Amino acid sequence: DRPWVIKDIRGGKEQWVYYCNTDWYHEMFRDEHPVQQHSISVSGGSKNIKYFLSGGYDRQTGIMKATEPDVFQKYNMRAKIDAKLNKIMSLSNNMSFYSSDYSWIGVGDIQDVFRNLRHTPASFPLFNPDGTGLYNNPLIIGGNYNVANGRQIVFAMGKHKNYDKKFNFANTTELVIRPVKQFNLTANFTYRRVNRNGMGRTVNIPYGIRPGVFGAYTTGAGLNELEERTRRYDYYTGNIFGTYEDSFNNAHNVKVMFGFNAETYRYKNVTAKGQNISDELLNDFDLIVPDPSTGAKITNLEGGQSEYALAGFFGRVNYDYKGKYLVEASGRYDGSSRFAKGHRWGLFPSVSAGWRISEEPFFAPAKKLVNNLKLRASFGSLGNQNVKDYMFMRTISIDDFKAFTFGEGSTKAQYAGISAPNSSSLTWETTYQYNLGLDASMLNGRLDFTAEAYIRDTKNMLIQGNALPSVYGEDAPKENSADLRTKGYEISLGWRDSFELLGKPFNYSIRASVSDYTSHITRYANNPDKRLTDYYVGQRIGDIWGFVVDGLFATDEEAKDYQANVCDALTYVGTNRMQGGFLAGDLRYVDLDNKQEGEGGINKITLGDNTADSPGDRKILGNSLPSLQYGINLGFDWMGFDFSTFLQGVGNHYWYPSGMNIAFWGSYSYAYYTAFMPRDFIKTVWSEENPDTYFPRPRVYSSTGGELAPPNSRYIQNVRYLRLKNLTVGYTLPQKWTKAICLDKVRFYFSGENLAYWSPIKKYTKYLDPESAYRRVTKKSNDGLYQNSDAKDAVAYPWQKTIMFGIDITF
């Protein structure tokens, strides 16, 4: 009952003064939300006609505590019919329909509210005592801080509406003609339409400045604006191919297939914006009113369209001798309009061979133990034409001068501009893969084992070309100038069996799998010096370079001695980030190369030449790609009860949190990033009374440009985990019961998703899911220090635990 907000005279005016302890996440998000899933299917037919029809509806209510919660709805339907027209012809049609609708209250994308709540101090309430929203007043950091950027007001108003609607329709019609037993001719055509429409509406955000004085946020999130977006995708695909299959002398089996494929893709988008909508509840461009200052309506319309075509010939030949020796050769010859003439066509052959060792006479003594043993090897190539449309040509665009007019009137002058230079020699990126595998089945099929190793070479990857002269004023065009080699393996082991339990069969199974891979750059044309600011030959993809830290300074004297003899200042840290120099509780960096940087002063903690061969005092601390990925499936059924579970995990996955990841750094990022500070955070922070802690001396902005910003060995995290991905328990009623009510099968079940996980990251924060703790390799700083940084790694929609109860009924 304490007065969390009081009125007081400050600066000669009556003001609100805040002494709150608000849990902003609890106030803005709910812990539980309902989920619905419904599905139905019908199948049947006769000797010559068979049909299948299914449909489903899903509805998920989100976690937002707005006037209207965020809601996702999905409808799907599938209809298939197969008809035998006569002795040699059959016709089938397969149609699918999918529609989804996601609506939410907010500004822009759904992650917006997470971004803004990160920096909301608990000392502020959501609203003032008079009911007005809290946004800004002179007492809040001198009037220079906006509480939650007004997102709690947005939730309460319910007028910032957004939706994203998707519609997906696909239909495939196929005709098969079989004039003789050994040969058939197949022709099919697929049409797919995808529509995606979206809307975003923002309105002015009113708030209270002080008692009786009000303001409004009218820019950015508070701009009175309506935006509507529409996207349309059309796909046309046709295939015609013939297949010949025959056997000779009960030993030789041959299958030959050859065909032609053609695809066309068209895309169009339109985005319209308008400001000054006359009604906050109605969203229509007809309600735009002129801007009072100019007398003109503020609108913007933009869009574009593109298309590409793909054509190709394909074929495959299979041969086996008594099911013992197996050979397959296949290939594609594809052409894409995304490349210039002379570079459009690519040939992509593949070949594989298998040897069923268990069919050899010499293997007969072991066949009771090993029922099937197969050795296989393959080589294959695959083309990739996923580049932007028209990338090989320069395009011309027309735009208006924003501030210049010619002649009388207000019509803006127009100009034409040409795009940056492109390489006309762009062509297919090609992947070559070599596989070696072993399949085994033992103990009458109860135990099975599969192992496979592979090497994948990706050739002619697109990268930025050699830099053009600076006077040219444009970036270099992209070229096919990089190669990548990936090596990996996959292993799977399974066991299934049954035994009698209380006179009833108890069937059970267990399966475990593990896989791993590494990727290295084998060619990269534009970085011969191996600068750490870019990719380089020999680099393992995902490597994290960082400094080595061997602890925290115990005393100020120890810190000053280090500053006098090892490093007087960290040149890559902003001067305002370490005021007072090194002090007790700061990180003690290790001088790995014993080299001095520059003239004057003492600085042995350096970046060296910033290359892989001369990285200064940095080394590779770990790798940001997950390794040793594994999964375990367990299941059994007995007397109508069934149980299954799936555990999934990663053996190693190194990650260095970005500066604004408050779930890990808390107030080390920004002083006012306290909305999600862990309750026991102060116990983990260094102080003279508590020196043996994990986190260092509190310094504002430490993780956003300070000593914690560059990756280091102390705070790099191994976010390996084991997750209980799914657990399902069901019970099927005895058939004698269901038959009595004219039903074939009735099953009740419970299912849980993401029920629990185990990870070492829990030792330092329980608010961070290991699968959301990752760094996208999207941008590198000029000095290469933040080569894996991504400020958005803490604002994804939270991982959710799902618990479902359901019933399956079969008629």
What are the functions of these language-model segments?
Residues 1-15, 107, 270-273, 498-622, ...:
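Conserved small-residue
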Residues 1-41, 52-72, 127, 133-151:
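Surface-exposed beta-strand-turn/loop segments characteristic
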Residues 17-25, 299, 612-616:
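Short Pro/Gly-enriched beta-strand edge/turn motifs at strand-loop
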Residues 28-105, 169:
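Transmembrane beta-barrel wall of Gram-negative outer-membrane proteins
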Residues 44-48, 57, 321, 442-444, ...:
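A generic beta-sheet turn/junction motif
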Residues 80-99, 145-202, 214-548, 705-707, ...:
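Extracellular/periplasmic, surface-exposed regions of secreted and cell-surface proteins
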Residues 577, 581-582, 623-658:
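Glycine-rich, aromatic-lined ligand/substrate-binding cores of catalytic
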Residues 646-721:
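C-terminal beta-barrel architecture of Gram-negative outer-membrane proteins
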